[in-house]
């Protein structure tokens, strides 16, 4: 952990509320050597403009020519487009390379609770390395986000399934509809994360599973959930608001009717296409965000760094085919 804290010690951390490392450079994946990977960080700040002002003064080389527009404009780019994250990539710190995304506390709160973008919330469905520990309010948001991931995944599974199948669903949620899984990402990524992090996934999700009265863990090879209409209706109502909004919008469009959310959810609980409907709603949130955030990352990184990063991603994708 000290190694990762040292990597971000080059940043101005006065406004930082929470920082974590994620991805294959920080979290072990099956058949991968993380010491050779670039380390990805998310930096949650209570004041994005102040963070960028101090960081441009301290580390101008981390930024593309956008730094010339000043911290106020960078904050606007961060907080008004795509997933509300501003990335600096291919930053050399000692012998490692890092990539860090900056997001405001208010935006991360919105994503964790409502799944507005399923971007940072999606990264936190999976195990991460907490480099700067969060306050209790942030801990509660992360737990609520993971509880939502559990409910969503259970709606995608049959009444009986294995622990590994559940973890595959949880890890796979944030890749639903992500165009990078078609071009640019390792095709075996989900399996590598589950296999390399099984114990950590169990540590994170076991307390949430134990709290779920409608789920019984008989053994790692057999979990049983209540598949009744009442249980499905209960789970649907616990989904984040953005997912529920998408479900309502999609079903009303298909059925050419205008019904409120409660009516739509009650109707869906009695149908046989719950999993497909939930998955479509989640994919509908992620798809445009994955495209717009990738474009934004290329814009913030500058041409040279974007080409280097894209080539590395494409190489990983081709090796996995």
UniProtKB/Swiss-Prot annotation:
InterPro entries: Tam41 (IPR015222)
Cofactor note: Magnesium. Also active with cobalt or copper.
Gene Ontology cellular component terms for the protein in this record: mitochondrial inner membrane; mitochondrion
Catalytic activity: a 1,2-diacyl-sn-glycero-3-phosphate + CTP + H(+) = a CDP-1,2-diacyl-sn-glycerol + diphosphate
Record-level GO BP terms: cardiolipin biosynthetic process; CDP-diacylglycerol biosynthetic process
Superkingdom of origin organism: Eukaryota
Keyword annotations from UniProtKB, A to Z: Lipid biosynthesis, Lipid metabolism, Magnesium, Membrane, Mitochondrion, Mitochondrion inner membrane, Nucleotidyltransferase, Phospholipid biosynthesis, Phospholipid metabolism, Transferase
Chief location: mitochondrion
Coiled-coil region: none
GO MF annotations in UniProt: phosphatidate cytidylyltransferase activity
Pathway: Phospholipid metabolism; CDP-diacylglycerol biosynthesis; CDP-diacylglycerol from sn-glycerol 3-phosphate: step 3/3
The protein's role, per its UniProt record: Catalyzes the formation of CDP-diacylglycerol (CDP-DAG) from phosphatidic acid (PA) in the mitochondrial inner membrane. Required for the biosynthesis of the dimeric phospholipid cardiolipin, which stabilizes supercomplexes of the mitochondrial respiratory chain in the mitochondrial inner membrane.
Family: Belongs to the TAM41 family.
Protein name in UniProt: Phosphatidate cytidylyltransferase, mitochondrial
């Amino acid at each position: 952990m000290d190694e990762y804290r040292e990597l971000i010690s080059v940043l101005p951390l006065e406004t930082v509320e929470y920082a974590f490392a994620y991805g294959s450079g920080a979290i072990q994946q099956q058949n991968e050597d993380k010491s050779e990977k670039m380390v990805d960080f998310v930096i949650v700040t209570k004041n994005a403009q102040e963070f960028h002002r101090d960081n441009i003064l301290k580390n101008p080389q981390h930024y593309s020519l956008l730094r010339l527009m000043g911290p106020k404009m960078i904050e606007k780019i961060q907080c008004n487009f795509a997933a509300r994250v501003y990335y600096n990539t291919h930053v050399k710190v000692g012998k490692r390379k890092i990539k860090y995304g900056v997001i405001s506390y208010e935006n991360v709160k919105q994503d964790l609770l409502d799944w507005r973008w399923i971007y940072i919330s999606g990264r936190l469905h999976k195990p991460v390395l907490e480099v700067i520990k969060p306050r209790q309010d942030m801990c509660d948001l992360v737990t609520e986000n993971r509880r939502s991931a559990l409910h969503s995944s259970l709606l995608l599974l049959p009444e009986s399934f294995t622990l590994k199948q559940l973890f595959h669903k949880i890890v796979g949620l944030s890749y639903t509809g992500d165009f990078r899984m078609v071009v640019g990402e390792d095709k075996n990524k989900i399996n590598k994360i589950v296999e390399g992090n099984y114990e950590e996934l169990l540590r994170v999700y076991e307390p949430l599973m134990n709290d779920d009265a409608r789920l019984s863990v008989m053994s790692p090879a057999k979990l049983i959930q209540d598949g009744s209409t009442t249980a499905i209706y209960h789970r649907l109502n616990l989904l984040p608001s953005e997912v529920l909004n998408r479900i309502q919008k999609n079903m009303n469009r298909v059925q050419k009717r205008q019904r409120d959310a409660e009516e739509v959810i009650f109707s869906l609980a009695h149908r046989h296409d719950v999993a497909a409907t939930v998955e479509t709603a989640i994919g509908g949130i992620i798809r445009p965000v994955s495209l717009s955030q990738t474009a934004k990352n290329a814009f913030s990184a500058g041409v040279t760094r974007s080409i280097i990063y894209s080539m590395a991603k494409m190489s990983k994708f081709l090796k996995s085919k």
